[in-house]
């Protein structure tokens, strides 16, 4: 039976990069691994086929030769599956792959490797003014952290874990699985390679405890809904001496009664009388600090927007600020008394006379010109 194209086996293109080839092999190895397909001869063959393809395509020299000459070009090279004498050879060669997938490499080499702790998320709601000016808050976070009593060893103070006698400290034992002899986590020590004979009374041998952690967090000025603050090392504790994960504080900003937000600009809507709009006015405008006076020019129309530069929200990590946008709405008077109505009608009549006077002047000029001729 003729061999399939290695690119076809891993389902990648001939232009695939190293990372893409590795991901494709991980997928195939996970799908056809003997542990997941006990007694399945077809899966076993596909597992070997994928290992052979990956061994060639991951190596630039072998891949170049294969691209030029195909399978015939691999004869005489220690490449392809012919270079592996047993499943241990496969797990040994690709231990990083199997360690990522199953938590340990061939022969248990990855059983006790360090693992980073999980990241945590904390949702924090702040007021509009605190988001604008910045603030400091105290958080109380539930976390899984290293036990202070045993310092993470899991053993009672003054004692230490002992090497597992079942696996000799390897964290894994070998089992026959069809064609392969594979490594699986040691059932006696759960893959740790060590056993705790005198467990810590505080964590009961786990090495970790659930507790509340108090943190003071500085919220920078200018944060918005959805802003994320990353606190390195404040997440869950790592395994086997691995680093802590991170804590992500996700911000929600409460709405404000006075201002609305457009990016880093503040928007304020205010009303003035039609007299103030017509004659001009000095308007007191609230800001994030002290109120200021703004000139409303004569003839201002309802809906006009005035821009006050630098009175908005600060940009994160910058001294620059957005603007304050003041939208003016002219209020139409209601509930007028008779005298007010009379004055308004007089005003309207005076306003209507102006164009008629202009027309009469034009006719007079035209008449004088004709008579003069």
UniProtKB/Swiss-Prot annotation:
* Domain J, chain residue ranges per copy: 5-70
Keyword Glycoprotein annotated: no
A molecular function (GO) held by this record is: unfolded protein binding
Placement of CXXCXGXG motif repeats on the sequence = 147-154, 164-171, 186-193, 200-207
Can you quote the record's cofactor note? Binds 2 Zn(2+) ions per monomer.
Protein location: Cytoplasm
Task: State where the CR-type zinc fingers lie.
Answer: 134-212
Binding residues for Zn(2+) 1, per the UniProt record?
A: 147, 150, 200, 203
Q: Which residues are Zn(2+) 2-binding?
A: 164, 167, 186, 189
Q: What SUPFAM superfamilies does this protein's entry cite?
A: Chaperone J-domain (SSF46565), DnaJ/Hsp40 cysteine-rich domain (SSF57938), HSP40/DnaJ peptide-binding domain (SSF49493)
Which Pfam families does this one have?
DnaJ, DnaJ_C, DnaJ_CXXCXGXG
CDD domains linked to this entry: DnaJ (cd06257), DnaJ_C (cd10747), DnaJ_zf (cd10719)
Xref: PROSITE patterns: DNAJ_1 (PS00636), DNAJ_2 (PS50076), ZF_CR (PS51188)
Q: List the disulfide bonds.
A: none
Look up the domain of life of the source.
Bacteria
GO cellular component terms, semicolon-separated: cytoplasm
Key words, A-Z:
Chaperone, Cytoplasm, DNA replication, Metal-binding, Repeat, Stress response, Zinc, Zinc-finger
Q: What is its main location?
A: cytoplasm
Q: Which SMART domains match?
A: DnaJ
- Cofactor names: Zn(2+)
Q: What is known of its domains?
A: The J domain is necessary and sufficient to stimulate DnaK ATPase activity. Zinc center 1 plays an important role in the autonomous, DnaK-independent chaperone activity of DnaJ. Zinc center 2 is essential for interaction with DnaK and for DnaJ activity.
General function of this protein: Participates actively in the response to hyperosmotic and heat shock by preventing the aggregation of stress-denatured proteins and by disaggregating proteins, also in an autonomous, DnaK-independent fashion. Unfolded proteins bind initially to DnaJ; upon interaction with the DnaJ-bound protein, DnaK hydrolyzes its bound ATP, resulting in the formation of a stable complex. GrpE releases ADP from DnaK; ATP binding to DnaK triggers the release of the substrate protein, thus completing the reaction cycle.
NCBIfam families, per database record: DnaJ_bact, PRK10767.1, PRK14301.1
How does this chain assemble?
Homodimer.
| Family of the protein in this entry | Belongs to the DnaJ family.
This chain belongs to the protein called Chaperone protein DnaJ
